[in-house]
């Protein structure tokens, strides 16, 4: 970052421009989209989810798919994930991190604030013995008959 400060002094660039340059140079996000069109014929057959699986997922995730539109969205999300089957990973070593090929600029690991437990726990809907409590798993969900046909 020091080289950017020197650049600022040399060129007399105003602060917003310098910040924009800094963000662009240090960003790990590509500046241009990197996706490609997917050949749908190479994907596995679309997944259809039966009502028993829907009910099971709703109870596990506490998400109510509610109607055909909710189920369609779930199936579309699975279809999107199916694109991973098209990725050729032959000869590719598993990664430790998605950014392992980049030098990441990290701040020093120094505690800057402390004793903020109460402030953090104040954000929770429910706390037991200084732990966040997830919603209970016994939330009543609609029966199969209540779904749109």
Swiss-Prot record:
Keywords: ATP-binding, Ligase, Mitochondrion, Nucleotide-binding, Protein biosynthesis, Transit peptide. It is found in: Mitochondrion. Its EC number is 6.3.5.-. GO terms for cellular component: glutamyl-tRNA(Gln) amidotransferase complex; mitochondrion. Residues 1-25 form a transit peptide. One of its GO terms (biological process) is mitochondrial translation. It comes from the Eukaryota. It holds the Pfam family GatC. It is an enzyme of class 6 (ligase). InterPro entries: Asp/Glu-ADT_sf_sub_c, GatC. It catalyses: L-glutamyl-tRNA(Gln) + L-glutamine + ATP + H2O = L-glutaminyl-tRNA(Gln) + L-glutamate + ADP + phosphate + H(+). Its main location: mitochondrion. One of its GO terms (molecular function) is glutaminyl-tRNA synthase (glutamine-hydrolyzing) activity. Subunit of the heterotrimeric GatCAB amidotransferase (AdT) complex, composed of A, B and C subunits. Allows the formation of correctly charged Gln-tRNA(Gln) through the transamidation of misacylated Glu-tRNA(Gln) in the mitochondria. The reaction takes place in the presence of glutamine and ATP through an activated gamma-phospho-Glu-tRNA(Gln). Belongs to the GatC family. This is Glutamyl-tRNA(Gln) amidotransferase subunit C, mitochondrial. It comes from Branchiostoma floridae.
